[in-house]
Amino acid sequence: MNKSKIRNFSIIAHIDHGKSTLADRILEITQTVSTRELKAQHLDSMDLEQERGITIKLNAVQIKYKDYIFHLIDTPGHVDFTYEVSRSLAASEGALLLVDATQGIEAQTLANAYLALENNLKIIPIINKIDLPSADPERIKGEIEEVIGISAKDTILISAKSGLNVEKVLEEIVDKISYPIDADDDKPLKALVFDSYFDAYRGVILLVRIFEGKIAVNDQFKFISTNKQFHVIELGVRTPTEVKKPFLESGEVGWIAASIRDAKDVSVGDTLTLVKNPTKEALPGYKKVKAVVFTGFYPIDGKDYPVLKESLEKISLSDSSITWELESSKALGFGFRVGFLGMLHMEVLQERLKREFNIDIIATAPSVEYKVYLTNNKVEIVSNPSDLPDRNYIKNIKEPFIRSFILVTEEFIGGIMELCQSKRGVYVNIEYIDKRVKIIYELPLSEIILDFFDKLKSISKGYASFDYEFIEYRDADLVKVDILLNKEKVDAFSFISHRENAYERSKELALKLKDVIPKQSFEIPIQAIIGAKVIARETIKAYRKDVTAKLYGGDVTRRQKLLKKQKEGKKRMKSIGSVEVPQEAFLSVLKSNMDKK
């Protein structure tokens, strides 16, 4: 293969700026997918992606354009999925920077553009949706130069929806993005595993970018970090369906099936090489991603525990950022402590468990990792409130802080600064960019994982965009709040809070639990306590509901239907002592401070 004819590139864009639509137009214009087969968001193969209109998993497709071969590596645009973007960029030589002509540069576009610059990628700026009446391409060009610091002189103005100027984008990819200069088939194999997914018949399928050397069917290869060895059964490229080939060579992006059955054997971001004549060094600059939000996942039916374990293993194959370990709860039995990159990431995984594996789960309140300094000079990392040691043994607790970047129009500055202050934020700076401002605050991570994003969108009428980076751990006055139901402690409802917010959050949670736990044949007190001190209390009055009371006459079948429906509902409850608790009660802990103003 002529290496000078290969172009590997990604698309960088914020949510809703038209990235998946542009990918669809490229597939259509190059006839990679016929117009008849083309559906909107073609590369977004997960149902969830199409419903939410976001890209979650990255996708890689080979495109033939004239006598060139393009490898388009699709990327997500939400802050939670930055790790997917870094993997795409590591496999590319260039990036299309796509900006909405009506919205301008958003915080996540900025973060991903900086990632591309750090990777020394050639960036091609593109302004999309120029056919909209409110489009202002000249202002957006100014933002590209001022905010990102690259020339906007050759910016391409397109409409991905109609296909206007998309052909021009293809020509720019040929002219501006470098071919894989270091590609050399004669060197030892050096390939980056940038993603993986699970196939029921063939095991784990690896997505790889070959940097040097070649790999063929029947070759023995190994992962450099673990030294685990495997045998290539089949390999090929995606167009976007799988096409088998006898070998993959340097510069190419493709897939490898090697009968890998155990999720733990695959390390996304690792370097592959051949067992015979291996490379001496791994590919540089690949950081393992770190989970920042932790929650307990428990099957509603205890019998589903092995199925939940297997499901998490399978999802881990295609999402290496998820961490999970066994944990148990007196209230909920056996489950897992699962780590995520953010709240959207967590919601997506819950949806996938339900859709792909048909498992209903209870999720406990999300938490972050705290550093707990003990009186015996030991340090413990705690992400589960139940694991927090007794107050008498704690010297101090530190919590993670982040630096947040909020891009918004000037009229919303006051409301957003007020929101940041209410979240214990520390003001850093405000930068004015044309008609918009970049507000920089340092915030405790625990304050943004629940409702910060929703409130930000609400205050700014949907116009604010948000990105953040971890900075350090800082001292904090934190307390553990326990919830008692009918005088029994429910460990799944415990949470860690800043002392000044503990009362308000406890009061709100007690009210929510009162709302969602059905009345039963005895009175149920709900109490929030710190140590032995009760800080909030609500009471559920006794009541027994007869679901068939509203029927008259002898309508036996209708009566049986209602009783069956009630029985099904009870299946979805957990007994805590003598109290039946519905799944919604656990979800209300998740959302316990969503509606605070």
Swiss-Prot record:
Example of a GO MF term: GTP binding
Principal location: membrane
Reactions the enzyme catalyzes: GTP + H2O = GDP + phosphate + H(+)
Enzyme Commission (EC) number: 3.6.5.n1
Top-rank taxon, per record: Bacteria
GO CC, alphabetical: plasma membrane
Membrane topology category: Peripheral membrane protein
One of the GO BP terms on file: positive regulation of translation
Residue ranges constituting the tr-type G domain according to the UniProt record: 4-181
Top EC class of this enzyme: hydrolase
CDD domains per the UniProt record, alphabetical: EF4_II, EF4_III, LepA, lepA_C
Alphabetized SMART domains for the sequence: EFG_C
Residues annotated for GTP binding in this entry: D16, H17, G18, K19, S20, T21, N128, K129, I130, D131
Compartments where located: Cell membrane
Pfam families linked: EFG_C (PF00679), GTP_EFTU (PF00009), LepA_C (PF06421)
Keywords: Cell membrane, GTP-binding, Hydrolase, Membrane, Nucleotide-binding, Protein biosynthesis
Disulfide links within the chain: none
Functional note: Required for accurate and efficient protein synthesis under certain stress conditions. May act as a fidelity factor of the translation reaction, by catalyzing a one-codon backward translocation of tRNAs on improperly translocated ribosomes. Back-translocation proceeds from a post-translocation (POST) complex to a pre-translocation (PRE) complex, thus giving elongation factor G a second chance to translocate the tRNAs correctly. Binds to ribosomes in a GTP-dependent manner.
Family: Belongs to the TRAFAC class translation factor GTPase superfamily. Classic translation factor GTPase family. LepA subfamily.
Name by which UniProt lists this protein: Elongation factor 4
Organism: Mycoplasmopsis pulmonis (strain UAB CTIP) (Mycoplasma pulmonis)
Lineage: Bacteria, Bacillati, Mycoplasmatota, Mycoplasmoidales, Metamycoplasmataceae
Gene assigned in the entry: lepA
